[in-house]
């Protein structure tokens, strides 16, 4: 049991973290070529104009040490929206090992690809739940090559409601800057999903591409939550106030997108503490930093 698990000083759950096995970390570009994941490679292995990598590739030990430095009690490991169904299984098995080894610090979601078909996809979800994974995502139908009304995805989202498993979806702001690997994700699709599956809890990543600011209908859909992942790369610090003006704090969930370096102008290494400080300075309280995530996982 970690010495930090009962610490009253630790009041943060980071609900948007990615982690990979050592075989990927050793040579991410070569791994992506071998596994047929060019979109992930375009997003995650490139360098910025100054030559600094867009993200790091820590192992689980490095992640835990960064959590300790930042005062993060628990991290939610999100899967990636892989192009290959086999890669989803590979990451799910890895996450199962992580949460069994560190149940007091790590929570994990399962990722899936409906292109695998009905029985393989649902069978994988059953296996992932048996291994201790508690949510589904990060998914991106638009990046993975299937429709939001895909029959297998519909079954997945119905099962998520039955099992009370939250679903994290990648969202791109339609007005955001262009970057390598950027994929359009029409905001109307997320409204449709929330209305079609009212018992499924969806977390829309990256502030949901500003969905509740541009579509008042979304504000009334209580099964839509919004995480703050990669916030400094996309928006200014005023984003916190803009969201709190239209949504209650119970629908905003803190997430960093670690190990993405969200403050590249301040140094080459990804870390969690600066975004936590930004959130607190903007008035984010326990609801956003801790309690909302806990409620998602309460069945």
Model features per residue range: what roles?
Residues 48-52, 84-89, 175-185, 262-270:
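Short, flexible/disordered intra-domain loops and linkers
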Residues 20-23, 82-85, 115-117, 143-144, ...:
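Active-site environment of divalent metal-dependent phosphoester hydrolases
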Residues 16, 67, 95, 136, ...:
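Conserved, mostly hydrophobic/aromatic
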Residues 133-135, 145-253:
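Catalytic pocket-lining loop regions of alpha/beta-barrel enzymes
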Residues 73-175:
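Active-site gating/metal-coordination segments in enzymes
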Residues 23-28, 89, 121-122, 180-182, ...:
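Short aromatic-enriched loop/helix-cap "lid" or pocket-rim segments at secondary-structure transitions
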Residues 62-66, 91-98, 124-128, 152-156, ...:
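A general structural detector for well-ordered alpha-helical segments in enzyme core domains, enriched
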Residues 2-18, 22-69, 74, 247-253, ...:
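Mid-to-C-terminal alpha-helical segments outside catalytic/metal-binding sites
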């Amino acid at each position: 049991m970690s010495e930090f698990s009962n610490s009253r000083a630790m009041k943060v759950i980071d609900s948007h973290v990615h982690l990979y096995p050592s075989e990927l970390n050793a040579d991410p570009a070569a791994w992506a070529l071998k596994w047929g994941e060019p979109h992930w490679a375009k997003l995650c292995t490139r360098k910025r104009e100054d030559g600094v990598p867009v993200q790091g590739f820590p192992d689980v030990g490095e992640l835990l040490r960064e959590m300790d430095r930042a005062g993060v009690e628990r991290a939610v490991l999100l899967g990636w929206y892989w192009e290959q169904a086999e890669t989803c299984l590979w990451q799910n098995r890895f996450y199962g090992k992580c949460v069994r080894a560190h149940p007091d610090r790590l929570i994990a979601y399962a990722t899936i690809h409906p292109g695998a078909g009905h029985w393989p996809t649902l069978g994988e979800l059953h296996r992932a739940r048996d291994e201790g994974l508690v949510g589904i995502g990060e998914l991106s139908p638009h990046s993975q090559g299937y429709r939001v009304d895909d029959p297998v995805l519909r079954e997945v989202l119905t099962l998520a409601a039955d099992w009370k498993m939250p679903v994290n979806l990648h969202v791109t702001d339609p007005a955001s800057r262009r970057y390598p690997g950027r994929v359009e994700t029409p905001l109307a699709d997320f409204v449709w999903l929330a209305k079609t599956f009212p018992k499924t809890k969806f977390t829309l990543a990256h502030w949901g591409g500003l969905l509740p600011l541009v579509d008042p209908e979304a504000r009334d859909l209580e099964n839509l939550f919004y995480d703050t992942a990669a916030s400094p790369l996309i928006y200014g610090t005023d984003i916190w106030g803009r969201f709190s003006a239209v949504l209650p704090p119970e629908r905003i969930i803190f997430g960093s997108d670690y190990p993405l370096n969200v403050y590249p102008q301040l140094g080459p290494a990804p870390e969690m503490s600066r975004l936590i400080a930004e959130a607190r300075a903007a008035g984010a309280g326990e609801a956003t930093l801790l309690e909302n995530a806990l409620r998602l996982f309460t069945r």
